[in-house]
Amino acid sequence: HGATPVVEYDGFEYDLAGKKFSELPEELQSAISQYRFSVQCLENYTMQEAESLFFNINSGVALSAVQKSKAKMGTDLIQFFSGLLEGMFFTQAIHITEAQARREDDLLMLLQSALLLDNRHDGLEYKTISAAYCLAYAESIKGSYTEEKREILREAVRFLDAAFPAKNKFLRKNNVPVVAVMARVAQEQGVTPDRFRGFINDFASQEHPAYDEASGSGNVKARSVQMRLRMMFLAFCGYFGLEAGAVGKPFADTVLLDEGTQAAEP
């Protein structure tokens, strides 16, 4: 690679940038050729055993919580979520830093979106959408994430793929799960992807003090997430001339639209 820095080997420095293997000094070619990988073949392992082994092998490595969730959720769900992450939205549109990419925060955002959609459609309770909580969520849906739930998430992501063909500064980690839920609301109201993108751009250009406050410290707590959902939902209804009370709320029925907090127990 052209950006490869100078390396030191056996007391000498070598410039490797932009060179092929055949262009390297003989001593480096020899050192590389003599390197051996330790490969172990595990036969007759079930997928559950392989997933457990992966988690245990990496438990001593500094993996992020969401990376550990890949071992917890199982092969089937990994394949499902990985397929959704290959679309335009998660590969081109979201605003993600290099460090976030290394932690696989795109998967975290997708898990957060799935969790919030589960809350909206099935009343799944949650206290936070932190990475650690999403790790537990990933384990809890293993073997129980129905085709109906998959289709809801799949349709929302496809809608986002169509709505955002290029990078959008608003699509940061804090906002993506909220936008994903609102994409589902937009679908239900017959809003096209292009018009939805117009709404998001308009929302991003306006001042929303309550939304901004809920995006600060503690932004992964349920109350803050619900406040952001509430503010974007009300802005959505105003933008498209919809009566908020006649549109499906972006969260479970146990959350009050006029408060953005959990309803009191009767």
Regions found by a protein language model. Give the residues of each.
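Basic- and aromatic-enriched surface patches that contact anionic nucleotides/nucleic acids
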Residues: 1-128, 252-257, 261-265
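C-terminal subdomains that position terminal phosphate/3'-OH groups for nucleotidyl transfer/ligation
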Residues: 110-266
